[in-house]
Amino acid sequence: MAFLGGYEKKHKVTIVGSGNWGSTIAKIVAENTRANKDVFEEDVQMWVFEEDVTIAKDSKHYDESIGDAPQKLTHVINKYHENVKYLPGITLPSNIIANPSLVDAVQDSSILIFNLPHQFIRNVCNQIRGKILPFARGISCIKGVNVSDDGVSLFSEWIGDGLSIYVGALSGANIASEIAAEKWSETTIAYDPPPMDNSRAPTPRSQSPGLTMTVTEPPADMQHRDARGRKSKTKLTPVPAEYPPLDHACFHSLFHRPYFHVEMVSDVAGVSLGGALKNIVALAAGFVDGRGWGDNAKAAVMRIGLMEMVKFGKEFFGETVHTATFTESSAGVADLITSCSGGRNFRCARKAVEKGITVDEVEKQDLNGQKLQGTSTAFEVNSFLTARGLEKDYPLLTAVNAILLGKASVDDIPSLVSDTERKQPLP
């Protein structure tokens, strides 16, 4: 996709993180920077947390002269163009530059793509604060939200507030191994261009995803607003006119591939919430599937869960959250379907019921010390709702928490969620 206008500078892109999903995103982005050299610098920096790796004997990169001697992961990626530890068997574009220095990797980059475990966000931001371009913009590929008794916060805003930049979010029914193998899938990118950027090349905005949109003028005060529509405390620096506009068209060209279709929306909160709440619903789907109730029961759980996801978003983020983000986008219903069909939360919940043990016991047996995202999110969301006296308004989310704590059984689910039939229809 060619951008007209003859801009003096191109956007440099850095991927912050190099795990399974981070390397997959780097592959996509590097393919597109190479295809859109009028907009982006071709080389893509990828920050790699340096570690020693040993190349397996059955790998095509195995060197008998080195044998089992450990090698630096960055060296291996740059030499063989493969992340042999986190994305083995997938050839990465040669314009990906693995960099062990976080500060050096982000230097002079106008687009930062974050893809790392959420518990490392604050440390990473502390390391690069004041060392990035002040007008840089970001995309968070970190699924989920942070929920505490105090409130719900978005990881994209953790990053944005920490670095004084604007950050959107990417989420969807995206299994990294399938995308890396170039099996077709969709994703949703939520990016609500700050008014000072949007005034250059306004991005159409609408109440729902899709191509038919209505342009709205940016606020006269050019004040950036957060995901709840409030004036943000973060003061942003406009993207200089020497660069192509960082709008929906630009990010679409950076992420869209023939095998990875991108839908652009403005609802950052909705996209982020979808990636978190679907894990709780997936546990419920696993419970009823493990009980042997079949596809009808699983479909009922998904329908009720989807309604509660929309309600949660509307109740705690207001009109910035759009129903269509949940009902029409990959970040909503598609990710929910994938998670309730074979995701890790679904599988562990199903096994717990089939074996007559707790989900916690399945975690200990099968996950090598890791924890399910669904269980922690279920506890956090329930605590948040209970602190506000709202747990009865979300019967499915509340039922999952009760089952996890042993206060209810799977057999109770139909009666626990029956009052959803009396609730108001989706707006």
Swiss-Prot record:
Which EC main class describes this enzyme? oxidoreductase
Biological processes per GO annotation = carbohydrate metabolic process; glycerol-3-phosphate catabolic process
Q: Which GO terms describe its molecular function?
A: glycerol-3-phosphate dehydrogenase (NAD+) activity; NAD binding
Q: What is its EC number?
A: 1.1.1.8
List the residue ranges of the region (Disordered): 192-238
Q: Cellular component per GO?
A: cytosol; nucleus
Record flagged with keyword Oxidoreductase? yes
Residues annotated as transmembrane: none
Similarity comment text for this entry? Belongs to the NAD-dependent glycerol-3-phosphate dehydrogenase family.
Protein name as it appears in the record: Glycerol-3-phosphate dehydrogenase [NAD(+)]
- What's the source species for this entry? Hypocrea atroviridis
